[in-house]
């Protein structure tokens, strides 16, 4: 049934939200008769019929609402018809002002007309004018347009007449016109207010609608049968449909107000970029916002080449979010995974442990283990993830187990080495397993008295075809073996030929394994002959060699080796090497076979042993500490190419640890391949559980021909299970997971491929995803259903139940103890306070000290203060200032104990003589350094100016219980001394560098991905490359150390209560050990001292040495020094000369282009303003787009904008906010959390201006005022030298802070240097980083030159190795300033010069080791005048 016009109107009224403003008659009886659509100019004309006239307010409201609703898609017009025109006269007058506005009259004419008196008579409207001139003017101007406007509103007006109004005088007319205008404006105002309210409600409703959209659905439904794999999208297409999971999303607003969404999706065959613009008048944006990474979508659209990304993209017409079935573990009884690698398995595991734990929890697993290679660095995150998911975490590691010593001689005999007979032999076989492979060639030579006296060479028939690998390796073909004798015959003959001689072989365990197994199978009795392994012998007596393979040793011993891997040739070469080795043994005093092992044993024997993988599982809390000790020892004491765990070490700390047999590289698996079952069972006895893994994880053994086939592999399973059963040891099935899902395998392939030396590159990587219970059962079905269930489910759950709950991270802070620390801190604070403020301390000083001491002592923080005080005191005693970082300057106790120079009290004067003081605590002064100079009224002495007005709460929190983080900036050259001093304070075994974990960065991952794809000859589009990069990013690559962090362990505990230890980046030559855990993981458990190295104290020390001026005596408010922060004039140069409007080049904190621009905008003149600028420059979203805009707009000045985090708390408290809320607000804002409703309410109630609230909302991070004050104090001192002692400053700057020198440019005249700088400015965007660094140096050099000083070339006679030296009005650069010349060479030049002058360039090269390139550079620089290429030989030298 067709919809009536009345129903159409109701729908329209509802859509434009106008129904509540219309009376019921209008709503019920109005009609929408039609809508005329003109596509040519996007015009919609609504034809509407009303039962009677609307009030002008409702008319304006209605038309405004309909235009607002459709404005984004059409230019809307309305034509109205009114059925009942009974009140037309009355409404025509009220509509007059609106109708005038619809004409094209000038604003002036419109304004005049609106004031006129009207008379309505029938269908004629009369407009009464003041005079004839006015009448004629209006009549001509309107020209029918007013009639059209009335008719559009539904009026039946046929004529508008302009008449002269003679009925009223001018005064009455003016009054009438004013009344008319007032009424018109009132009606328009009311309509506008209602419309704006409707708009606001609509916007709010849209926001609500957006928040209600939880699932994206735009456009038409997409047929599933049309969906294709993304890898099939290879060219432009009119229409295609794909589905995939979102791995990246970018939603941005365009200048037009529309939005564009860019999705990167993958279906794991490939990836594609999907794009879509929001459509006008649609809620697409809400749907876009419902999308997120990890959601699956189905999309349809046009495939086109995007000119910007130069790749195929889909321009979507339709998109819908879909539910994708995820893998479930549907087994009723779930397994427990005991072998799993995370991203902490270096360049091998992919996911974070939390990803595994989340998956296990979703599958319903009750527990899960983590067993990374050689490390336990995932433990902290594992603990957090397990607690979050309510799952039991089992902590473990896959380590490298080695025997403490590998024997050189087997079956020792009391036999003189010099007179013994030796049989040097070699076997070629069908494979590497003496249990499953066969001997195909046996060759030997007999050695006596240093000579080969006999040979033995036989093939044997294996009765099977050789693999291509064996043929290529041994150069033996099947034809060569067809007529060969049986192995029984060969071995029987061989045993007889050998007699009681001593066997010698290279890697004897392999060859003897085949001989012993062969003798046993043939039944001719076990061999009792002694054995010498030349591989292990060489490793012991040739420790200087990095390799010990047969090829390498043959060259070293001068022995010819042809056709390597043919038994007879290998044997002869080995024999000749062995003869020479015997002479080495004799030289070492080894004369008897039974003495070889004992005489040649050494502490490094573990290095020779072949590592076997082993799984170590923590059973209880004691086991955790023991594992920490094992990990530490393997990384520190027993590291050789990889961390190693000697068996004796494991035995010593085995309590509380369950030992598992690990993977195919474990000892038990290897034994199955190389030894008989009785030996396997004996070896298995050492373990607490035996592991078997799915056949897919052993597939590479078959691929590499180490295992013959699946049948052989199944036999290996049975022997492993038998070894467990015989010893009553549980056998468990483990997954050896390295990634979460099958499709993540590519990321591991890429990482492995990025490591050329990784042995995994030799084979196809096995499928190592995290398996469900049913997957494991299915893959082990060949064992039988019952046995598979036992290994996969029952035994893993039983083993998990034996493991206690273990907590790897402490939940409290353990600080070191220092006897009497509380009393010492209190006494020191008051003693120094009295020394500064007098015995009768001001109440403000007492109150602040007591407030702080109560928190410091009450929370056990005294020792932290005392440690910092000792470190600072030692540095000061040794002549180096210490700068403070962070918020420590907020603590007055820190000031009084000389930890920081920053005084946080309100600005004040102090008399150094009579100790009178005057405080300004009303916020009127920003810094005590800004107070005017003043003399003491009592004694006339110049008053000291102090105080930065910083609340204590910003350091230890509002309750004073936040652990203090005292960061100290020591001189970079003094930092090692400060670090070592902590060893004196606490003991070497109580202090460690804070460890860090370096992961694969996005840029590095991109290189890995591109390299892999190029090597494989694969082309992938950009979206897929981005996905692969994400998969590789975040994987552990190395370890390191915090630049200044020192971890202090209390004397009542040891480091293993918190973390294992290691060397940074496994550098065994490092002088410091680091925490194994990333220091953030234990930040709340142990004290961390931040003893950082910084250039400022080093530069201050050099300036002090050059000038003899104590930096503490420098006036902080020196006017000329302050002047350079707004102008270069105090330096005696102009802005044009140095190309800068300030004089702060090279001044710490104020020399960068970013901060110099801030200085230009703010023009600071005081210390407090510099502190504010420092805060602004170090914050995030504090200056740009925030304070800068406020200052430039004139709304604020530097003094009023938010600069440092403390500003917020202080300002809000001054404005009346309750202190705890002011503190909470500061904490929220400085961390980028914005403002809560209660904060906003309190701020508004206390009349905090709107701009302040907006500024707070924009801030992401804020700098502490104390940190800024400390930095600025150092900066002003250095700036003082720049102004008053220029050459001292420039010599110090170039020596301490500068690098990347362009000496060729620096030695030129000032105009040339200035031109060079100007030229680099013009090309700045194209400069490489190194060029930009050079530009920084040249800016300083230009300034120095403009001030009348110059740089000399390097002088062979005068230049130092590292320091710039002053000579007159010039500087002489050091040798280190030469590009590409390192520290060692720079020092060597000076040492060679001290031995005598350089006679020639050749002599310079010979004595100092300078390259030809460096010599040429020095020559170009003019540093080698008159130095010949070669020395001339004098007659007196002959």
From Swiss-Prot:
GO cellular component: cytoplasm
UniProt keyword annotations, A-Z: Cytoplasm, DNA replication, DNA-directed DNA polymerase, Exonuclease, Hydrolase, Nuclease, Nucleotidyltransferase, Transferase
Pfam families registered for this protein in UniProt: DNA_pol3_a_NI, DNA_pol3_a_NII, DNA_pol3_alpha, DNA_pol3_finger, HHH_6, PHP, RNase_T
Catalyzed chemical reaction(s): DNA(n) + a 2'-deoxyribonucleoside 5'-triphosphate = DNA(n+1) + diphosphate
Boundaries of every Exonuclease domain copy: 422-578
Root EC class: transferase
UniProt-listed Gene3D superfamilies: 1.10.150.870, 3.30.1900.20, 6.10.140.1510, Metal-dependent hydrolases (3.20.20.140), Nucleic acid-binding proteins (2.40.50.140), PolC, middle finger domain (1.10.150.700), Ribonuclease H-like superfamily/Ribonuclease H (3.30.420.10)
GO terms assigned for molecular function: 3'-5' exonuclease activity; DNA binding; DNA-directed DNA polymerase activity
UniProt subcellular location: Cytoplasm
EC number(s) stated in the UniProt entry for this protein: 2.7.7.7
GO biological process, one term: DNA-templated DNA replication
Predominant location: cytoplasm
NCBIfam families in alphabetical order: dnaq, polC_Gram_pos, PRK00448.1
Functional summary from the UniProt entry: Required for replicative DNA synthesis. This DNA polymerase also exhibits 3' to 5' exonuclease activity.
Family the entry assigns: Belongs to the DNA polymerase type-C family. PolC subfamily.
Protein name, entry field: DNA polymerase III PolC-type
């Amino acid at each position: 049934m067709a919809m009536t016009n009345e129903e159409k109107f109701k729908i329209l009224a509802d859509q434009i939200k106008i129904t509540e403003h219309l009376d019921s008659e209008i709503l019920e009886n109005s009609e929408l008769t039609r809508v005329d659509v003109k596509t040519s100019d996007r015009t919609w004309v609504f034809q509407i019929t009303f039962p009677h006239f609307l009030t002008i307010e409702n008319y304006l409201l209605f038309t405004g609402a309909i235009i607002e609703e459709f404005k984004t898609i059409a230019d809307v017009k309305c034509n109205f018809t009114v059925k009942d025109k009974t009140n037309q006269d009355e409404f025509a007058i009220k509509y007059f002002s609106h109708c005038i506005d619809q004409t094209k009259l000038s604003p002036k004419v419109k304004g005049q007309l609106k004031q006129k008196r009207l008379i309505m008579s029938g269908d004629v409207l009369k407009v009464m004018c003041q005079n004839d001139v006015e009448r004629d003017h209006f009549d001509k101007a309107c020209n029918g347009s007013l009639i059209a406007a009335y008719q559009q509103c539904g009026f039946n007006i046929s004529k508008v007449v302009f008449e002269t109004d003679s009925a009223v005088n001018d005064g009455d007319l003016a009054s009438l016109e004013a009344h008319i205008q007032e009424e018109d404006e009132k009606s328009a105002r009311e309509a506008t207010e209602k419309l704006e309210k409707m708009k606001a409600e609509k916007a709010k409703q849209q926001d609500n609608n957006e928040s209600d959209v939880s699932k994206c659905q735009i456009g038409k439904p997409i047929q599933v049968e049309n969906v294709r794999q993304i890898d099939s999208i290879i060219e432009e297409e009119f229409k295609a449909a794909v589905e995939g999971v979102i791995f990246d999303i970018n939603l941005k607003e365009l200048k037009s107000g529309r939005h564009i969404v860019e999705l990167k999706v993958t279906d794991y065959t490939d990836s594609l970029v999907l794009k879509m613009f929001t459509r006008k008048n649609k809620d697409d944006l809400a749907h876009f916002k419902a999308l997120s990474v990890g959601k699956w979508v189905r999309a349809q659209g046009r495939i086109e080449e995007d000119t910007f990304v130069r790749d195929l993209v889909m321009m979507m017409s339709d998109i819908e979010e879909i539910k994708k079935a995820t893998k479930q573990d549907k087994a009723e009884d779930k397994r427990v995974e005991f072998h799993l690698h995370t991203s902490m398995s270096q360049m091998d595991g992919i996911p974070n442990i939390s990803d595994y734990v989340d998956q296990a929890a979703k599958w319903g697993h009750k527990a899960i283990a983590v067993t990374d290679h050689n490390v336990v660095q995932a433990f902290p995150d594992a603990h957090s993830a397990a607690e979050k998911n309510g799952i039991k975490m089992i902590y473990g590691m896959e380590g490298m187990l080695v025997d403490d010593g590998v024997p050189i001689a087997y079956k020792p005999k009391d036999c003189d080495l010099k007179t013994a007979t030796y049989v040097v032999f070699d076997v070629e076989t069908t494979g590497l397993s003496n249990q499953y492979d066969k001997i195909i060639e046996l060759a030997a030579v007999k050695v006596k008295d240093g000579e080969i006296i006999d040979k033995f060479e036989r093939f044997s028939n294996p009765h099977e075809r050789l693999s291509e690998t064996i043929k290529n390796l041994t150069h033996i073909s099947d034809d060569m073996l067809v007529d060969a004798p049986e192995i029984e015959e060969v071995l029987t003959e061989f045993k007889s030929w050998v007699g009681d001689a001593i066997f010698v072989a290279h890697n004897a365990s392999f060859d003897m394994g085949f001989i012993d197994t062969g003798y046993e199978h043939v039944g001719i009795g076990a061999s009792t002959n002694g054995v010498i392994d030349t591989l292990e012998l060489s490793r012991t007596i040739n420790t200087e060699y990095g390799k010990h393979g047969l090829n390498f040793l043959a060259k070293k011993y001068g022995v010819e080796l042809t056709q390597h891997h043919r038994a007879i040739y290998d044997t002869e070469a080995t024999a000749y090497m062995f003869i020479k080795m015997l002479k080495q043994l004799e030289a070492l005093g080894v004369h008897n076979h039974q003495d070889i092992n004992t005489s040649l044993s050494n502490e490094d024997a573990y290095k020779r042993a072949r590592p076997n993988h082993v799984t170590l599982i923590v059973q209880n809390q004691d086991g955790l500490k023991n594992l920490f000790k094992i990990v530490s020892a393997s990384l520190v004491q027993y590291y050789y190419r990889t961390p190693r765990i000697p068996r004796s070490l494991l035995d010593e700390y085995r309590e509380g640890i369950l030992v598992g047999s690990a993977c195919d590289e474990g000892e038990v698996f290897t034994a199955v391949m190389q030894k008989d079952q009785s030996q396997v069972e004996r070896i298995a006895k050492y373990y607490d559980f035996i592991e078997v893994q799915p056949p897919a994880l052993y597939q590479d053994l078959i691929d590499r021909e180490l295992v013959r086939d699946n049948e052989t592999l199944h036999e290996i399973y049975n022997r492993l299970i038998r070894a467990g059963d015989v010893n009553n040891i549980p056998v468990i099935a483990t997954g050896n997971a390295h990634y979460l899902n099958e499709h993540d395998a590519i990321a591991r392939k890429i990482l492995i491929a990025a490591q050329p030396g990784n042995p995994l590159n030799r084979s196809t990587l096995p499928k190592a995803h995290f398996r469900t219970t049913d997957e494991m059962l299915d893959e082990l079905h060949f064992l039988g259903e019952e046995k598979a269930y036992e290994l996969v489910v029952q035994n893993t759950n039983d083993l998990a139940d034996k493991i206690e709950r273990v907590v790897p991270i402490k939940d409290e802070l353990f600080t070191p103890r220092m006897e009497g620390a509380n009393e010492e801190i209190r006494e020191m604070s008051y003693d120094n306070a009295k020394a500064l403020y007098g015995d009768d301390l001001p109440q403000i000083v007492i109150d602040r000290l007591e407030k702080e001491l109560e928190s410091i002592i009450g929370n056990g923080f005294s020792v932290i203060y005392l440690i910092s005080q000792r470190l600072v005191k030692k540095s000061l005693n040794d002549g180096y200032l210490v700068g403070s970082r962070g918020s420590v300057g907020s603590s007055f106790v820190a000031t009084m104990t000389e930890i920081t120079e920053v005084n946080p009290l309100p600005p004040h004067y102090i008399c150094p003589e009579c100790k009178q003081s005057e405080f300004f605590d009303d916020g009127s002064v920003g810094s005590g350094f800004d107070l005017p100079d003043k003399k003491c009224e009592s004694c006339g002495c110049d008053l000291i100016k102090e105080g930065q007005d910083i609340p204590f709460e910003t350091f230890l929190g509002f309750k004073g219980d936040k652990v203090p983080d005292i960061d100290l900036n020591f001189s970079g050259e003094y930092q090692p001394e400060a670090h070592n001093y902590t060893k004196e304070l606490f003991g070497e075994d109580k202090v460690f560098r804070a460890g860090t974990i370096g992961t694969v960065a996005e840029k590095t991952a991109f290189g890995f991905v591109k390299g892999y794809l190029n090597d494989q000859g694969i082309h992938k589009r950009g979206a897929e490359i981005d996905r692969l990069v994400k998969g590789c990013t975040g994987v552990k690559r190395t370890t390191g150390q915090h630049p200044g962090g020192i971890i202090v362990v209390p004397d009542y505990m040891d480091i293993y209560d918190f973390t294992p230890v290691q060397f940074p980046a496994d550098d065994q030559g490092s002088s410091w050990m680091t925490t194994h855990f990333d220091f953030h993981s234990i930040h709340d458990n142990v004290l961390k001292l931040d003893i950082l190295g910084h250039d400022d104290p080093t530069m201050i020390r050099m300036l002090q040495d050059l000038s003899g001026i104590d930096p503490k005596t420098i006036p902080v408010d020196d006017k000329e020094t302050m002047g350079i922060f707004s102008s270069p004039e105090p330096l005696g140069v102009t802005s044009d000369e140095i190309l800068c409007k300030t004089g702060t080049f090279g001044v710490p904190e104020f020399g960068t282009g970013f901060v110099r621009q801030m200085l230009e905008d703010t023009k600071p003149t005081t210390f407090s303003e510099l502190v504010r600028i420092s805060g602004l420059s170090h914050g995030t979203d504090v200056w740009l787009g925030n304070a800068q805009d406020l200052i430039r707009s004139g709304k604020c000045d530097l003094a009023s904008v938010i600069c440092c985090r403390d500003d917020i708390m202080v300002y809000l408290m001054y404005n009346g906010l309750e202190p705890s809320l002011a503190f909470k607000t500061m904490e929220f804002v400085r961390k980028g959390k914005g403002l809560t409703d209660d904060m906003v309410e309190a701020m508004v109630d206390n009349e905090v201006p709107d701009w302040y609230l907006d500024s707070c909302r924009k801030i992401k991070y804020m700098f502490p005022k104390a940190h800024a004050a400390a930095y600025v104090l150092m900066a002003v001192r250095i700036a003082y030298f720049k102004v008053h002692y220029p050459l001292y400053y420039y010599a110090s700057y170039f020596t301490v802070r500068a690098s990347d020198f362009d000496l060729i440019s620096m030695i030129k005249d000032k105009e040339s240097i200035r031109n060079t700088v100007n030229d680099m400015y013009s090309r700045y965007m194209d400069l490489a980083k190194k060029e930009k660094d050079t530009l920084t140096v040249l800016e300083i050099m230009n300034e120095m030159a403009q001030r009348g000083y110059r740089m000399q070339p390097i002088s062979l006679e005068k230049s130092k190795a590292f320091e710039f030296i002053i000579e007159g009005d010039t500087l002489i650069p050091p040798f280190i300033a030469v590009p590409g010349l390192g520290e060692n060479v720079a020092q060597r030049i000076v040492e060679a010069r001290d031995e005598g002058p350089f006679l020639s360039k050749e002599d310079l090269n010979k004595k100092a080791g300078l390259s030809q390139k460096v010599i040429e550079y020095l020559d170009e620089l003019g540093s080698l005048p008159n130095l010949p290429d070669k020395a001339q030989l004098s007659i007196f030298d002959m």
